[in-house]
């Protein structure tokens, strides 16, 4: 028996030598590399198999270049062609249902005429946060806490939004301080080229930290650094893991530098939040952390639970807001004819009553400009994202099995005259489109930047619309207003509006672009 085993082993060794060694006995590859290549080949085939799988929803799929294009290639192309694929589908089907294939999932695209049908399901049968968690591998990026309860939504809706009018002076105070730290020093009449995208992130980070942590802790540099790093590491980690089969994610994730950075951010964030909670005495603090601590019940009260929610809320409130603001700054500099009318409006409001509780509500033109900029350059091309956990059949007979992910092509809709109000064609940028319509008292509230309806879902729609949109709107209007009063902005000589970068179904302002800034002086008044 031992002899037989010895012979078999010898035979296997010879076979292996023939495969690995050349005729001259020269190694073709190291044994370890053979193992790596074999594993890599298996992994590639497995990934292609996963990318080639598709949903069972029987509606047209858009994006294929030909009948011969493999599904895995279409999913990869969606990363950089997502915007055009969605637009192609909307233009072709418009009022009927279609689907797109992206990395990790298929998305059934619902036109607005079906919205009332699909939004009727109760929250236990549909989750609007789940698509975000899935896209960014929430199990590894610590996003699963949002699936456990809606503590953060309760705090925003019940505590933050009712307090917004009293927060204007608080936010302005922190913005004034932030400008001294984040705008570079410059001489009178000196134009300085700046990275406006990064500046916006830092300005919004500081304002948000004031609202999130209160005046005593908002300038904690560890927290400010963490919130900036966390978003970047989460995005990179989630994007990479999206193409990795679930069975391999526990092994691949620890190898990613971004994942290790993310874990460090989470650990640091827990420490900061824990220290603040332990240092707080009694009630009366007017900040999100205090409200969240007071509203938490059961497991929500755990420091780790609260800290993770604070990190994700910071991600949502800072980076989408900063990108929207960067888009608006690019639009403003590309269309300088809007600068003086907007500045005059801000001056008129402030001269009349200062930054009182109603100041931001009276900036009608500024509100309109931000809404029009968002119409052209939304951060998200698809909104009303949700996953259904109950099978349903729509009025046209389309069956959506349990587990179906749906979304609305909000950006494509906002390029369609059927969904864009006013006499100016939707293909033309009209910064005062909405303020002109709102001059009619019948539409005074309908076309606010923060308002949503079935034609404009940039912030979502209905009870699942972004709960923080009213805060974000005020933050953006305040920031743009102060910048207009204190600075001049323009594009570098010979440059046009920076082109947007579309990644998957997101529209990102070019982070490489620069703007020129100059302090305004008394003679500019």
Swiss-Prot record:
Gene3D superfamilies per UniProt: Cytochrome P450 (1.10.630.10)
Family label? Belongs to the cytochrome P450 family.
One GO cellular component term noted in the UniProt record for this chain: membrane
Task: Tell me what topology the record assigns in the membrane.
Answer: Single-pass membrane protein
Which catalysed reactions does the entry list for this protein? ent-kaur-16-ene + 3 reduced [NADPH--hemoprotein reductase] + 3 O2 = ent-kaur-16-en-19-oate + 3 oxidized [NADPH--hemoprotein reductase] + 4 H2O + 4 H(+)
- Does the entry feature the keyword Cell inner membrane, yes or no? no
Q: What is known about what this protein does?
A: Catalyzes three successive oxidations of the 4-methyl group of ent-kaurene giving kaurenoic acid, a key step in gibberellin (GA) biosynthesis.
Q: Which domain of life is it from?
A: Eukaryota
Named in its record, the pathway it takes part in is: Plant hormone biosynthesis; gibberellin biosynthesis
Q: Name one GO biological process term.
A: secondary metabolic process
Q: Mind telling me what this protein is named?
A: Ent-kaurene oxidase
The record, for InterPro entries, names:
Cyt_P450 (IPR001128), Cyt_P450_E_grp-I (IPR002401), Cyt_P450_sf (IPR036396)
Which gene holds the coding sequence for this protein? CYP503A1
């Amino acid at each position: 028996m031992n002899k037989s085993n010895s012979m078999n082993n010898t035979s296997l060794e010879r076979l292996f030598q023939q495969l690995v060694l050349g005729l001259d006995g020269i190694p073709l590859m190291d044994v370890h590399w053979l193992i790596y290549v074999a594993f890599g080949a298996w992994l590639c085939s497995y990934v292609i198999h996963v990318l080639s799988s598709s949903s069972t929803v029987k509606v047209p799929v858009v994006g294929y270049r030909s009948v011969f294009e493999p599904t895995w290639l279409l999913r990869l192309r969606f990363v950089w062609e997502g915007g055009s694929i969605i637009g192609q589908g909307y233009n072709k089907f418009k009022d009927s249902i279609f689907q797109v294939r992206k990395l990790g999932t298929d998305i059934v695209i619902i036109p607005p005429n079906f919205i009332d049908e699909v939004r009727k399901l109760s929250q236990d049968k549909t989750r609007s946060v789940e698509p975000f968690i899935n896209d960014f591998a929430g199990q590894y990026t610590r996003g699963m806490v949002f699936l456990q309860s809606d503590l953060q939504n309760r705090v925003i809706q019940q505590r933050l939004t009712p307090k917004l009018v009293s927060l204007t002076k608080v936010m302005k105070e922190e913005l004034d301080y932030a400008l001294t730290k984040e705008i570079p020093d410059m001489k009178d009449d000196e134009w300085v080229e700046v990275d406006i995208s990064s500046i916006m992130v830092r300005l919004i980070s500081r304002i948000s930290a004031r609202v999130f942590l209160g005046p005593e802790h908002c300038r904690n540099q560890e927290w400010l650094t963490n919130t900036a790093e966390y978003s970047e590491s989460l995005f990179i980690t989630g994007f990479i893991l999206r193409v990795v089969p679930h069975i391999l994610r526990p092994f691949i994730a620890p190898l990613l530098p971004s994942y290790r950075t993310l874990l460090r951010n989470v650990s640091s964030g827990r420490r900061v939040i824990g220290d603040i909670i332990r240092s707080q005495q009694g009630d009366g603090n007017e900040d999100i952390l205090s409200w969240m601590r007071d509203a938490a019940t059961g497991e929500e009260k755990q420091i780790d639970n609260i800290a993770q929610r604070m990190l994700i809320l910071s991600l949502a409130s800072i980076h989408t807001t900063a990108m929207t603001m960067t888009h608006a700054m690019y639009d403003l500099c590309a269309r300088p004819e809007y600068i003086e009318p907007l500045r005059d409006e801000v001056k008129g409001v402030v001269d009349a009553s200062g930054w009182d509780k109603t100041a931001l509500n009276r900036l009608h033109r500024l509100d309109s400009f931000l809404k029009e900029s968002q119409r052209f350059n939304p951060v998200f091309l698809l909104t009303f994202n949700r996953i259904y956990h109950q099978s349903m059949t729509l009025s046209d007979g389309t069956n959506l099995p349990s587990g179906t992910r749906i979304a609305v092509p909000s950006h494509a809709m906002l390029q369609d005259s059927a969904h864009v109000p006013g006499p100016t064609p939707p293909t033309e940028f009209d910064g005062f489109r909405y303020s002109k319509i709102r001059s009619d008292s019948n539409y005074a509230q309908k076309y606010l930047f923060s308002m949503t309806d079935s034609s404009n879902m940039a912030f979502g729609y209905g009870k699942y619309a972004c709960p923080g949109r009213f805060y974000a709107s005020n933050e953006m209007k305040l920031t743009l207003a102060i910048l207009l009063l204190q600075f001049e902005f323009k594009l570098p000589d010979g440059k046009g509006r920076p082109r947007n970068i579309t990644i998957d179904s997101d529209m990102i302002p070019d982070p490489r672009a620069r703007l020129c800034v100059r302090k305004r002086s008394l003679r500019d008044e």
